[in-house]
Amino acid sequence: MRVRESELPGIGQKVEMITRNRDKISIIIHHDGRRELYYFDENDHEECVASVQFDDAEARQMSAILGGMAYKPKALEQVESALDDLIIEWCKAEAGAPAIHQTIGDLNVGQEYHVTVIAIVKKNQDKQLNPSSETVIDEGDTLVISGEGTGLKRLIREKLTAKGA
């Protein structure tokens, strides 16, 4: 994630972030504790499409939630212990990732990474449950994958992120 900070004289500080998936978010932190969060159009980073304002307490609570400190569902704890080392992960295929335009079979996810592709949510939100080995992965597809941590991390690093290219 790219992060750029700048001072806003008389107002506070501005933080701009561009995520791995090329989403742009700006946060303005006012001297009085208010925070304004802006989300920009994915095709035009100058066009704000949504915004929200938080007071200081709301911003701190949101930070704890995003950081995973505020809430962990009890059911999730039970599932984690029942499944032991099995992890289910949602991962978006980044622009420039080696997996783009490859089939699941081409990637050899089962043999090479010991991972199963449970589903794919296409960029247009079309859902493919239990996709076949002939299913092609496109930029922006979200893969729901399961396996053990090492194989999952390796697959994500080597095939689903632009760094793997």
Curated annotation (Swiss-Prot):
It comes from the Bacteria. Transmembrane segments: none annotated. InterPro entries: AAE_transporter (IPR050144), K(+)/H(+)_antiporter_KhtT (IPR026278), RCK_C (IPR006037), RCK_C_sf (IPR036721). Residues 76-161 form the RCK C-terminal domain. One of its GO terms (biological process) is potassium ion transport. GO terms for molecular function: monoatomic cation transmembrane transporter activity. Pfam families: TrkA_C. One of its GO terms (cellular component) is plasma membrane. PANTHER family: K(+)_H(+) ANTIPORTER SUBUNIT KHTT. This is Uncharacterized protein YrvC. It comes from Bacillus subtilis (strain 168).
